[in-house]
Amino acid sequence: MSFFSELVSTIFERRYQKVLLKETEGKTTVELADALLGSIGEVSGVTLARSILDRYAIMSSNEKLDFFEFMTDKLEIDPEYVIKTLDAFKINPNKATYQAFAEASEPKRQELARRLNQVPGATAQLVKLRKDLLGMVKDRPKLGPLDVDLKHLFASWFNRGFLVLRPINWSSPADILEKIIAYEAVHAIHSWDDLRLRLKPTDRRCFGFFHPSMPDEPLIFVEVALTKGIPNSIQELLADERDPINAADADTAVFYSISNCQAGLAGISFGNSLIKQVASDLATDLPGLSTFVTLSPIPGLNRWLETSKLANENLGQDEALAAHYLLKAKKPDGMPLDPVARFHLGNGAKVHAVHAQADTSENGVEQSNGTMVNYLYDLSQISQNHEKFVGERIVVASAPVKTLSASVKIKV
């Protein structure tokens, strides 16, 4: 198409969109959604989608609930028709019968979400929409199927192939830096000076995953300290008066904070890919790095101690209790009770060391008496560790941690 043809087409589309927008003014949001599902033309579809998203953005909580209930109840599958098409496929499995079954099995709300996503910037709006939904679904279980469908779509839209790994440093745009301050979920960043100490020194790194449809919104980011040796205290790692080292002199990369940024992407895992990609990139850029570890919180430790059947003589043995908790406290499915442990062990890390008085902040003391843990990412053992953990529920740990755990006395 020539430049002139494109220009004429663009002018026509804009004028047509104005006409269509005027036509939407007298219709309800539900009517617009039905029209969008029945639309064929690209221009009309984009106009309808934009109108729906613009309306959603100014809805009250009750209006959003009404919209969610419409998507859940009115755009549901027809179970009887699904069974009918499945029976037809069983009798005569071919392309046509399978396609009929596949179409019957997909709720119309998935197609509505896809069509809404035609609008530039719609992906971020749909992520916010799911955030709103998650705030309601706990008290309204019938909205659960809508969440399942949105999560299914997001898992595809946000798969690793679409994500872009970007370094975040003191020279990054101010709006990105503001979001790092706001989204930091592990060790609060209290000021711009605090942020500068995390990003500017030569022995500090930060990386985030971004999506092309949300270029100014980090999805997840990890903060990294380059050190000599494995640290045993977050206070020392983040001390204001510490002396930075040259990155080339470091032998250890410490992942000390991982923050998910988008509540609407809950349940979509990015951390596994992020840590492995960052570790690989750092190993390439800094050949002197030989050790990759975390310095992680143990958020469930104190809650577990309140209900566990441990002998009184264990009191004060913070490192032993933490080791025992990480290795032995399990959910009914055999997975570790601690969510951070499940994450890192599922990634193929192992429990390397535990440290008392490692986080003396109010939050650190409240959740684990200040105890923290190093998870070691041995790049040559990640796959084997992952298989042991996922397949056999084996928590891979160092000998010192196993010894500490075994020293804990149980009530009889």
What does each model-identified segment do?
Residues 1-412:
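Extended, composition-driven regions rather than compact fold-specific motifs
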